[in-house]
Amino acid sequence: MDSQRNLLVIALLFVSFMIWQAWEQDKNPQPQTQQTTQTTTTAAGSAADQGVPASGQGKMITVKTDVLDLTINTRGGDVEQALLPAYPKELGSNEPFQLLETTPQFIYQAQSGLTGRDGPDNPANGPRPLYNVEKDAFVLADGQNELQVPMTYTDAAGNTFTKTFVFKRGDYAVNVNYSVQNTGEKPLEVSTFGQLKQSVNLPPHRDTGSSNFALHTFRGAAYSTPDEKYEKYKFDTIADNENLNVSSKGGWVAMLQQYFATAWIPRNDGTNNFYTANLGNGIVAIGYKAQPVLVQPGQTGAMTSTLWVGPEIQDKMAAVAPHLDLTVDYGWLWFISQPLFKLLKWIHSFVGNWGFSIIIITFIVRGIMYPLTKAQYTSMAKMRMLQPKIQAMRERLGDDKQRQSQEMMALYKAEKVNPLGGCFPLIIQMPIFLALYYMLMGSIELRHAPFALWIHDLSAQDPYYILPILMGVTMFFIQKMSPTTVTDPMQQKIMTFMPVIFTVFFLWFPSGLVLYYIVSNLVTIIQQQLIYRGLEKRGLHSREKKKS
């Protein structure tokens, strides 16, 4: 197998993968977009018995820190809107990215409270609690490292429930502390809960869209337990009422999308019930309900949980909860993408530019793979040297395919040639290529990351298609420089158009990925010349002139 056949193999693998990816996306098409009415109904099944009742309208209070801009409803204390000032909605825009939203078109909320037999959020105890708050707006002042937002509610029996949001400077993790003061004569039984609910269908203003050739990151629910470090749960599965019902100590529940996530992390030593539910009106939920806690008469009980609402910053998420960093969607090649990203981030700490970091990591990867590349070209050169013997054998044996196969294998063995030696480096390169793609599409650090000149976002396609064209040119040069034994007219035509076909595919790919491929091709050209010189010295004539 020569290098041009290798290009054909890469193309077939690549096209096959893209067709499979498109088929996977089309198997479960999104239902038609519909308007969503605002609702706060809760989960069915395991959590419905003591879940979140329908609630009347409360007062909206705002909380602003250096990284979060939240709106909290005093009816229940749910976070109904979350803006991220550090992340613009679009490149060059002053409008912050909106993660949580409550509008007639779209619902995405982080709900929490106290359920259980005596909890104020238990539907059996009436409407959700209407908390009292001392002011309507809270701001983390300059020089202030922590901001507390206390909300209090006193039930008909005189018991006081306090829900306090605790914000820290530069932190997307928000602690939610509960205090239960029992003024009665009987123990109070309460359980904390945290629930994330979201409309299944994305309205136009939230659907970023992508080309049919692009890989799509996961949007849906997820959870983690000590036994299952990271499990995805599709919105479609929840909408079909195939619900989760798992009990475990520790862990978390989350909702994910490209670059951003929300998660509830219970902070207790007891058992938590993780559940999903179809809430109706096109809304699904994932949540947890903690093990009940008894607060004795005259005593005050304390409970806490943590809400993550923000970008998927891996090191910060890992510090909040075990395996929370796995929510960064690197697909099925995460075991390659994660170390690649760590290496890329380490390089970036020195060079300060993600584009140059990609160039450097390309040289590193290709340098590590150089022995395999050299073995590949050596194997192909030996295969070309054997072509006269193979052709003579075929003419001698005629149509006896079995004997041809036997004698060919004997010839390979005698000459110490591995017919698959040229394929192995390609098998290694393809997963690295795809893993880099997942890394570019899933790492928040590369969102809107500039390179140089006209490339202002390495995670987006080249707006002028210059990089894809350059990639096609480098591929054309590799093809022209590579000796070939392809004689089939159809294969020759396919190989002629291969740079054009790849250029068209890469028009919609992230600029960072195209940059990687250009640099990789340039390295290939250099390595080819070095390897060919060595092969010529060994008498392996690799620079055959192509027939015009």
Swiss-Prot record:
Check the record and name the InterPro entries matching this protein: Membr_insert_YidC, Membr_insert_YidC_N, YidC/ALB3/OXA1/COX18, YidC/Oxa/ALB_C, YidC_ALB_C, YidC_periplasmic_sf
| Keyword Acyltransferase in record | no
Example of a GO MF term = membrane insertase activity
The family classification in the record reads:
Belongs to the OXA1/ALB3/YidC family. Type 1 subfamily.
The question of whether Hydrolase is a record keyword is answered with no
Organism encoding this protein: Salmonella paratyphi B (strain ATCC BAA-1250 / SPB7)
What HAMAP family does the annotation carry?
A: YidC_type1
Membrane spanning stretches = 6-26, 350-370, 424-444, 458-478, 499-519
- Chief subcellular site? membrane
Q: Which Pfam families match?
A: 60KD_IMP, YidC_periplas
User: Bias category Low complexity: which stretches?
Assistant: 29-42
Q: Which UniProt keywords are given for this protein, alphabetically ordered?
A: Cell inner membrane, Cell membrane, Chaperone, Membrane, Protein transport, Transmembrane, Transmembrane helix, Transport
The entry's function note states: Required for the insertion and/or proper folding and/or complex formation of integral membrane proteins into the membrane. Involved in integration of membrane proteins that insert both dependently and independently of the Sec translocase complex, as well as at least some lipoproteins. Aids folding of multispanning membrane proteins.
Q: How does the UniProt record describe the way this protein sits in the membrane?
A: Multi-pass membrane protein
Q: Where is this region: Disordered?
A: 28-56
The protein depicted here goes by the name: Membrane protein insertase YidC
Provide one Gene Ontology biological process annotation: protein transport
Query: Where is this protein localized, as stated in its record?
Result: Cell inner membrane
Tell me the subunit arrangement: Interacts with the Sec translocase complex via SecD. Specifically interacts with transmembrane segments of nascent integral membrane proteins during membrane integration.
Its Gene Ontology cellular component terms are: plasma membrane
